[in-house]
């Protein structure tokens, strides 16, 4: 781990313009926006801010090379992704430094994201050559049936701020593998990592125009003209449920293929037969990874009443070991929230819970200074009516609710409009399968607190989204199925 990289030299290497048709260029309006370090409030970079004209120019560039790119061989595309995987690892400390500077997570966590994010490049470099079709006769014997997958076409990829590298690789890699061109819109709060990743893709040999990047302060100025353009054939979005719903409405006019990875309200269920020490260790990963700013973060700890006190005290002991501060400082294990609005929201959720009878076991205070810090917090005696139990927290707060039996645990866990991640700790294998059948979530971790993996299909149900990213399913989101019915020469006329 190298935290001694010269930050000024690194920031000077990161492109701050728009990537259109393989060229970095200024926004047509000349407008810019600033990127701040959430640990200090200092401006660390100023980027060109794309408008509607720039967005359309990026789509023009993507469309201009779509047919040629689709005709490249799977091996060519796989080799580019593999080279990108290698380059990301060669630049691991640079990527980690950028993430910590613009997003705030501790440097060691940023290093972990580099490893995780790069795996999507390696995984889809392998999947690119495994995009199999199917051949069989129809039951009547009159036709020979061939099904094959074709690139869906130009894509708009919109990524969030909380995992600046992994969310870009998780969308770009399958699009490249499938033979699609794309326009990438990174989050305005954390665009630097994506900008550097785009340059890395070019360095890996990606042809001009295949990947275009339009960072900007106005998301709607970029998304609206593209969604209205019939040439765009695919939208992939990771972000909040309200924004996702708005984008879905915009995608309806042109009947776009959509992938939506939206909000979550993950339950973390601890049954009476669970290994409590193991559950606490899993809870630290499920809750405090990324300081809780993750859609998969454990949002509600649903604990059997007979072990609630033991679990709470042991979890509190671990929370109190966390060191809050600037993620670039040695020994820091808990960084800042992304912005002042996020800090205010977390504080308001805790205040609402306390007003409704919850008890602060540890934490519950804002940090001092310029950064957006909040102490890791545990709340006990939390009711289901509190905002902290109903809303996505996106912060270092662990509300603990209790239950009496398995049916109540499932009722509490499913009492949400969301259905992304869930976690269960039990030593009973029969219960594991019963609970899996009863939970309404797309992802389930059993005796495991961190379950995301490039080889796994990631996605939710209900208001948590549509489609899957990663796994063998991930490349399918960027393809359309074509059926060929070929007359069987041995059949009758």
Could you describe each region identified by the protein language model?
Residues 1-39:
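Hydrophobic face of amphipathic alpha-helices that form TPR/SEL1-like repeat modules
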Residues 41, 77, 99, 121, ...:
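Residue-level signal for inorganic ion chemistry
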Residues 42-45, 232, 269, 323, ...:
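Conserved C-terminal structural/oligomerization subdomain of aldehyde/semialdehyde dehydrogenase
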Residues 42-132, 142:
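Glycine-rich loop-to-alpha-helix module at the N-terminal edge of alpha/beta enzyme cores
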Residues 44-50, 65-71, 157, 268-271, ...:
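Short, well-ordered beta-strand elements within core beta-sheets of diverse protein domains
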Residues 133-278, 403:
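Rossmann-like NAD(P) dinucleotide-binding subdomain of oxidoreductase/dehydrogenase enzymes
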Residues 181-183, 360, 443:
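A short hydrophobic/small-residue beta-strand
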Residues 242-383, 446, 491-493:
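ALDH superfamily catalytic-core signature
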């Amino acid at each position: 781990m190298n935290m001694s990289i010269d930050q000024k030299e690194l920031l000077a290497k990161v492109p701050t313009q728009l990537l259109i048709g393989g060229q970095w260029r200024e926004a047509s309006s000349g407008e810019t926006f600033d990127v701040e370090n959430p640990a200090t409030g200092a401006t660390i970079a100023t980027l060109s801010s794309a408008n509607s004209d720039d967005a359309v120019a990026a789509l023009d560039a993507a469309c201009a090379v779509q047919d040629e790119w689709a005709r490249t061989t799977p091996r060519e595309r796989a080799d580019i992704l593999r080279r990108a995987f290698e380059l990301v690892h060669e630049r691991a400390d640079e990527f980690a430094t950028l993430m910590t500077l613009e997003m705030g997570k501790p440097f060691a966590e940023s290093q972990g994201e580099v490893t995780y994010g790069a795996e999507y490049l390696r995984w889809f470099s392998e999947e690119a050559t495994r995009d199999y079709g199917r051949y069989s006769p129809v039951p009547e014997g009159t036709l020979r049936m061939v099904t094959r997958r074709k690139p869906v076409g130009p894509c708009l990829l919109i990524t969030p701020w909380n995992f600046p590298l992994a969310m870009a690789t998780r969308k770009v890699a399958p699009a490249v593998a499938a033979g699609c061109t794309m326009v990438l819109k990174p989050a305005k709060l954390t665009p630097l990592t994506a900008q550097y990743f785009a340059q890395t893709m070019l360095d890996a040999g990606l042809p001009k125009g295949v990947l275009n990047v339009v960072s900007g302060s106005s998301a709607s100025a970029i998304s609206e003209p593209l969604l209205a353009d019939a040439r765009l054939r695919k939208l992939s979005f990771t972000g909040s449920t309200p924004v996702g719903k708005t984008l879905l409405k915009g995608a309806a006019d042109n009947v776009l293929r959509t992938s939506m990875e939206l909000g979550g309200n993950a339950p973390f269920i601890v049954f009476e037969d669970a290994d409590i020490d193991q559950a606490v260790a899993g809870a630290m990963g499920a809750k405090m990874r990324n300081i809780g700013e993750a859609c998969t973060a454990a949002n509600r700890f649903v604990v059997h009443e007979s072990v609630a006190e033991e679990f709470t005290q042991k979890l509190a002991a671990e929370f109190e070991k966390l060191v809050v501060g600037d993620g670039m400082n040695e020994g820091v294990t808990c960084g800042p929230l992304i912005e002042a609005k996020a800090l205010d929201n977390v504080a308001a959720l805790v205040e609402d819970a306390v007003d409704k009878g919850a008890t602060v076991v540890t934490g519950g205070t804002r940090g001092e200074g310029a950064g957006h810090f909040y102490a890791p917090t545990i709340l006990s005696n939390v009711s289901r009516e509190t905002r902290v139990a109903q809303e996505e927290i996106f912060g270092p707060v662990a509300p603990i609710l209790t239950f009496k039996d398995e049916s109540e645990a499932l009722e509490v866990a499913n009492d949400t409009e969301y259905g992304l991640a869930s976690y269960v700790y039990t030593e009973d294998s029969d219960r594991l399968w019963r609970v899996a059948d009863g939970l309404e979530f797309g992802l389930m971790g059993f005796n495991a607190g961190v379950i995301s993996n490039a080889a796994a299909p990631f996605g939710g149900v209900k208001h948590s989204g549509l489609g899957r990213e990663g796994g063998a399913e991930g490349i399918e989101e960027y393809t359309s199925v074509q059926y060929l019915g070929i007359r069987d020469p041995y059949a009758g006329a």
